Structure formats: structure tokens, C-alpha cells
Amino acid sequence: VDGTCLRVPFPEGEEEEGERYRCSIRQGAYKAFERNGLVFAYMGPPEQEPPFPEWEGNFTVAETDELVPYSNFQHCNWLQVQDNAADNFHTMALHAKRQVTGEKFQGTTFDEVGAASMEVPPDMHFVPVQGGRSLACSGARRSDDGHMYIRVQHQVLPNLSLHAYTSEDGHKKKLFGRFNIIRWTVPVDDHHSKMLGWRVLGPGIDTRGVGDKNLVGYETMDFLEGQVALRRPQRFGQYKLEDMPPIPSDHRAREHYKDAQYAPGDYEAIISQRQIAVHALENPTKFDAGVFMFRKLLRDAVRGTNPNASPEKFAEWLREEGAAPNSYCSGNVFELPVGRTKEEEVTLRRHLAREVVKILSAAETVKGAQREAFVRERMEALQAEVLERRAA
């Protein structure tokens, strides 16, 4: 990883000269290191190397949990893959049981994994945070008559997304649940990319015990079917988890292409936009604001009009944060009854979506257990304030 020459051929008896020669040469190399099954490389000027961001110090992994690496290939450019993560509203359409044609269910919907709350259309609130370096995507949805679920996804420039618990049913109070997926969207070329990252698995985050380590790895992901070109019957029908099966040349070359159209997953939704989506053909609603806000943050960073997101300022910020910046990523279930009127319910959803982000912003100056206690205390106060106002 540092270009060191490991050995040179030399005749017996000339070992000393061979060793001197070996130590005198070095191949050009990029600095690389391994972390929990993933290899990271720094490819910029050595004198400008930023610290590796250990989000929250340990990626919020509980002692009972672990980081499980995965690599998922995508037949399109990286930006529209990242768009999918910023589009927090899409779960109610793409991943809803009612969208599957002819009841040909294949595991692509949240209802099939007992997390129907994710199929409820949320009220969305998008806020650029951390000096314009990232975006907090706060969605408020009613999970049952006694609970309101606020899920905050964190999109970090240029290609990182931090996802809260993906199997939340929203039927039990939970404040400040943390990372369930950590994902970097990495370009391969203009027309292909990879999703590389970790799935956090264990009883700390997976309170419903539905995660499956045996389905996380190369060209496979456990939380919903349809994340990669190969569906599970093809991925595991002939291959083991540790194998590296061939990837189809394109999405239409798959033998199960037609079957996948009955129950499309994220892969189908992303890839079917072309290898490079034409933005001029889009028909956005207000709930797509997160996609457009993230694109603008990225565009401004590239153009230099978002100076905080420049490589130099980003590195400076990471050093100031001790290479362990805080994240807005969180899953929160409040014990709050349904509004007495539709207007009251809508007002409540929007209020909670905004206030949760404000609480997380107020906690940016503290770290670790102190921050966790601060956030939970403020969220308890938020719930009490809503209930008190309801009783007045």
C-alpha cells in the first residue's frame, strides 16, 4: 500500500547487495488501508490528506453489533444512485405492497418485512446542515394511532449516505436510533458505479431481529430484494455468499428481467432512467426537494460557490471535529395520538419534522454520550410539549 519493494531476485551469496538494492527503490503508490472489510485509498496530494472520517467516533455501532461490508454494482452513473438515497419519499411508492403487479411479491416491499410504516407517505423537511457540507432529510409519518415516526437520513457531500433503521415498524417509542446502513456511491466510469459500505447488524440497532448477515456481501443486500441486478434466487441458487458471481452486462440481459418488472426494487427504479438520467425530463413534486437540494449543494461545491465543501475546507472541518463528526441520521418514534382533525395532524407532522432537525443541530457542539443524552432529553421535552398543548 506504500510502494515498498518486497523482494528482488539475486544469486545465492549476494543477499546483502540484493537487500540494499531492494531498499533503494520504491514504486509510486496511493495510501490505502482496510477498515471492517472495505479498502479505502487517498488519491490526492499527500500534503493535503484529510483525516478519515470516523462518523460519531465508531459509526454509532453498539457493543452488541457489527459492521458487515458489502459491494453492490449499478449499471448507471453514480449521481442517480445517490439521488435515490436523497429521495426519501420514494419508499411510499416503490416499496409499497400495493405497487406489486398481480400480487407477484418478491420481497421488494416494506410490508413484506413487517415495516409497513415506511410505506406511509411522509411529510418531508430538507435542511442543508454542517455549513452546506451535508443535507438532513427529515420525514414524519403516522405509524399507528398512538405513534409518530420521524426518520432522518443524512446525505453528506459528495457521495456518502447514512441511513437509520430500515425495518422500523413504529409501534414502540424509540428516540435517537442510529445508523443501520453506511454507504458510499463510487463511480466506476460515466455509466457504471458501485454502492460500497457497511450494514450495521445486531440487537442494538436491529430491534426487530430481521437483519440477515448471510445476505450481505458481494452483489447482495439483506434489507429489501431488488438492490442489485441479481435477485436472490439467481445470486444464491448457484453461488455461495463468499463467491463473486458474474454481473450481467446490462439490466435487460438478466434472465429474470420480466419477473423483476412485476415487483421492481431500487435497482430497477434507478437503472431504468437510462445510464445517465436526463434531468430535463423529470417532473418533480415538492417532496422531491431533497434530490434537487443535494444536487445544488454538490454543483455549488464543484463550482466553488459552496466554499465550505471544498476539499481544503472539508479537511479543515474534519480536523476541527477530531475526525469524528456528528451525524443527523436517526430514527425516532414518539408516543403521540392522532390529531383531532386532519389539519391538526398535518401541522403536527410538519412541526415534528422541523423540530427534530433543530434538536440535532443544537447538539452539534457536544459529542458521544453527552450528545446522546442531550438529544433524548430534548426529544422527550418535545413530546411533552406537544401533549401539553393538545390537552390545553
Question: Where would I find each of the regions flagged by the language model?
Answer:
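Active-site-proximal cofactor/substrate-binding loop regions of enzyme domains
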Residues: 1-45
